[in-house]
Amino acid sequence: LSSVVIPKTVEGLDFGELIEGGKNPNDGAAIISCPAPFGQWARRWGGREFRGIRTVSHTYVEDLRGPWLMFDNEQDPYQLNNLLNVPGNEKLAGDLKQILKRKLKATNDEFLPGQVYVKKWAYPLDKTGTVPYSN
């Protein structure tokens, strides 16, 4: 739109064509993630690394051990009922897993343990394993 060249390091979708009346680049699935659990969701409170996708109809999440959560966002908007291990949902879980795999590959996300990212990005941690914050 502004004729500025987008650097190769910029991640995400370019909606410029859509704004000009063209194709929508969105495939309907957004990545959700917790690269390293800390703060309000620290390990001591059950926090864990995860990657997932959210579509209009479903949310699917994996932790480092594998599939973890799957919700029907239309029937269960508060995500109270994990459908992952409910018989009959295997195909849906498999389809959502493939979308997640494709998204992670497209974003070069290796989905490694949180400590790898803490070291890579040189985050300082306090004694609780949380990035300190002061206002």
Show where each model-derived region lies.
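Polar, surface-exposed loop/tail segments
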Residues: 1-49, 89-99, 112-118
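Conserved beta-strand positions that form and line the central face of beta-propeller blades
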Residues: 14-17, 79-83
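Generic preference for hydrophobic
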Residues: 30-33, 60, 70
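Short conserved micro-motifs at the rims of enzyme active sites and ligand-binding pockets
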Residues: 41-45, 64-65, 72-73, 83
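Low-complexity, glycine/alanine/valine/leucine- and proline-rich hydrophobic stretches
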Residues: 45-67
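Intrinsically disordered, low-complexity polar regions and short flexible loop motifs
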Residues: 76
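Long, internal low-complexity/basic segments
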Residues: 83-135
